[in-house]
Structure formats: structure tokens, C-alpha cells
From Swiss-Prot:
Name of the protein described by the UniProt record: Putative pre-16S rRNA nuclease
Keywords: Cytoplasm, Hydrolase, Nuclease, Ribosome biogenesis
SMART domains recorded: YqgFc
Record-linked SUPFAM superfamilies: Ribonuclease H-like
Length: 138
């Protein structure tokens, strides 16, 4: 069983998957959002392909730790995923993951155009890896 990581944006969803042992996260793709039903169908494909029973969703929090409108949207979407796909949804504080993703891509000397295309996939990898690191310490 693997674990999926999602970075939910208003236009795209970054998708990452754990290795079979749950130690490392690898970025899979970025899905262009269309509507809720199609977004859920895309996520279901990944759940089926990787036999994922747990999905970690990045939870946007304000810098003071409170949950704002984006966080509420992520939590509502997570609830829909949980109900429709019969998977366990976990939330992971995603503060600064996109910043870290941009920094890593700049250090890798990726062009602005390339960074724009993969930033959500890279951010989903950071989200999932943070969660995997936390559960491995338990």
C-alpha cells in the first residue's frame, strides 16, 4: 500500500506517491482542475493504480497557525475524497512548501516556464515527504 500526497491549487492539483515501504515521496504529475467530479475521478485513478488507502492533503494555514478560506476549501475537498473514494484523508501543514519547491527548482537552475509547470508536483512531494518523515519517527 502506498500513500498519495496532494497539493490543491485553484487551477491544478500536484500529485505525489510514496514508495511501497513508505519512506520516500516521488512527484507524479500535475492535474489541471476542471470540476469536482473530474478532479475526484483523476484522484481515484491514482488510488487504484497505486493501491493507495491514505491521501495526505496539504492544508494551507496562515502564518499564525489559523485556517483561512483556502484551508477550509481543502478540508471540505478532503471530506469529499474520503467519502467518495473510501480512503483515509490526512492533512499536513503546507506552509512554505511552495516556497521551498521554488527554491529547490531555482537551485536546480530550471527555467521559469519549467518551474511553473511542475511547482505543484514538487510541492506535493514536500507535503507527502513531511508526513512520511513524521510517521517514521513514531
Amino acid at each position: 500500500m502506498r500513500i498519495l500526497g496532494l497539493d490543491l491549487g485553484s487551477k491544478t492539483i500536484g500529485v505525489a506517491v510514496s514508495d511501497p515501504l513508505g519512506f520516500t515521496a516521488q512527484g507524479l504529475t500535475t492535474v489541471r482542475r476542471t470540476n469536482k467530479e473530474k478532479d475526484i475521478a483523476e484522484i481515484k485513478k491514482f488510488c487504484d493504480e497505486y493501491d493507495a488507502k491514505v491521501i495526505v492533503i496539504g492544508l494551507p494555514k496562515n502564518m499564525n497557525g489559523t485556517i483561512g478560506p483556502s484551508g477550509e476549501i481543502a478540508m471540505a475537498f478532503g471530506k469529499v475524497i474520503e467519502e467518495e473514494l473510501n480512503v483515509e484523508v490526512k492533512f499536513w501543514d503546507e506552509r512554505l512548501t511552495t516556497v521551498a519547491a521554488h527554491k529547490a527548482m531555482l537551485e536546480a537552475d530550471l527555467s521559469r516556464n519549467k518551474r511553473k509547470k511542475i511547482v505543484d508536483k514538487v510541492a506535493s512531494t514536500y507535503i507527502l515527504q513531511g508526513y512520511l518523515d513524521m510517521i517514521s519517527r513514531k
